[in-house]
Structures are given as structure tokens and as C-alpha cells.
A protein has these predicted regions:
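A contiguous strand-loop segment
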Residues: 1-148
């Protein structure tokens, strides 16, 4: 069902503040971020000098998760799992559009919630609290205890 799904990505040619440029794009792509290794998606965060990338490319992983939700809801054989996954997304909300850091980790966050849909709540809560998507969303990615 998801293997045949495509999502449009479209943006004009442009450049960033460092002068890195990109060509205009308008194409239909498969939902490849859903099964991508999170380490591969981290490259979307490395967009410094010499690595110009349009924002739509960095936001793409989260957009794919959002696009996949209704497809799974309609076509999944385990529809109750989809309902519970959406419930946990609503309960442990991570605004995927907050920034590109959250977006890059959103497919892994979705997979984690999906895996815990009917599991142990305490285990899921621990995984949510340590999730890179949640840490970026809460601005806790670089948080550390004071040496007091």
C-alpha cells in the first residue's frame, strides 16, 4: 500500500544566505523516509556552508509520515493499531513542522509509537522521553544538568 504511494515535492530555484544554490524541482517521489535509517535522515540537518538545501527537502520526512497516516488508516489490516498510533501521536504531540531537526527524526518517532501502540506504557514513556524528535521539539537536545 505505501510502496505505491507518491508525494509531490515542489520548490523554486533558490539559494541560501551563504550563496549555495539549488535548482527548481517539481516531482512525485515515493515515501522513502518512512523506512530510511535515521542515521541517513540526520544528513538533512547538515546543511551548513556548501550544502545548500531547500527547506522542503529538510521537512520531507515529516510530510511523508503525515501523508502515510490516512493511507495506513484505510488500507492496514491492523486498523486498531493505526487508531492507537494516532492516539499516541495526539497524546505525545511533537510538532513536526517546528523545525527541520524535529522533521528529520519524525519517521523514527512514528515507528517508535507504532511499535508501542499496544505495549507497556512505562517503556513507551521512557522511549518518548529519550526520542530525538521529542528532545528537539522540547528544546532539550542540548540540555544538561548544572554542576551544582
Amino acid at each position: 500500500m505505501l510502496a505505491a504511494a507518491r508525494l509531490r515535492i515542489s520548490y523554486p530555484a533558490g539559494s541560501d544566505e551563504d550563496g549555495n544554490s539549488w535548482e527548481a524541482l517539481d516531482e512525485m517521489r515515493p515515501l522513502s523516509a518512512l523506512t530510511a535509517d535515521p542515521a541517513d535522515l540526520v544528513r538533512l540537518l547538515d546543511w551548513g556552508p556548501g550544502k545548500g538545501m531547500e527547506f522542503s527537502e529538510r521537512a520531507r520526512p515529516a510530510q511523508e509520515v503525515i501523508a502515510a497516516a490516512p493511507i495506513r488508516a484505510v488500507h492496514a489490516t491492523a486498523q486498531l493499531r493505526e487508531v492507537m498510533t494516532q492516539f499516541w501521536h495526539d497524546h505525545f504531540n511533537v510538532a513536526s513542522g517546528k523545525d527541520e531537526s524535529t522533521a528529520a527524526f519524525f519517521p523514527a518517532y512514528d515507528a517508535m509509537l507504532r511499535g508501542h501502540a499496544f505495549g507497556n506504557f512505562r517503556t513507551m514513556l521512557g522511549d518518548v522521553a529519550r526520542s530525538p524528535a521529542m528532545l528537539y521539539y522540547l528544546n532539550n537536545a542540548d540540555s544538561a544538568a548544572s554542576p551544582a
